[in-house]
Amino acid sequence: RDPEMSRGLGDVYKRQIVGSNGAGKSTLFNAITGGFIADEGSILLGGQDITFAPEHQRSKVIGHLFQDPLKGTAPNMTIEENLALAYLRAGTAPNAIFSRISRKDKALFREKLALLDMGLEDRMKQPVGLLSGGQRQALTLLMATLVTPKLLLLDEHTAALDPATAEKVLALTKSIVAEKKITCLMVTHNMHQALELGNRTLMMDAGRIVFDVKGAARSKMTVDDLLEKFRENAGKNLDNDRILLSKVEK
């Protein structure tokens, strides 16, 4: 319900999105990826109207990581086959790459996997189903950014991981997004992350954006300030347990 969301994606480095369950965060992402067609308004990406573009076409330019680390990979396929599939999805490689992965592509995959610092470059022939949740999420991140997307959507992509692994995957995310200068939308229930990561914070309630802050005003805000702004604009307290617990966690 906020026209600024569709107008401003192209000029933003990274936005954090906060809201309680049912606020519309996942619905927003589904509208962007083409999971359903919006009832009204339009969705622009890089100046191009993608409102009615099919989901498979949008997937070539939009990367998407889910909270569940099992959703972004094919478990019965090997690591290198998953990476080859990511190449195909982006439309940057011929179909033949999937049946016969060239030495050049294997070398590229090995190089990119080594950057994850998880030893996956030495396990390229192993099925992805044998990896841990954190390893699979890191691989999904690599697949989503192997060919730089116009937009990267992160739907609480570290929430299901243990704290140490979540921190590592988040660090990888920050590094890749910064290096490739990827426009990114990230849903989080962590209030500290909402203020510390990226350069803009949005708060949602009942399908609408109730608070939007950036720049100097954002840099001065505390978690309590953010919660108070939500109360003022939404007319109620933000009472999600995970969000409130994150007030005292860093």
Which residue stretches match the model-derived regions?
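Helix-to-loop junction immediately C-terminal to a conserved catalytic motif
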Residues: 33
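The feature captures the beta-strand-to-loop junction immediately N-terminal to the Walker
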Residues: 18-20
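ABC ATPase nucleotide-binding domains
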Residues: 218-250
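Conserved ABC transporter NBD signature motif
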Residues: 41-49, 211-213
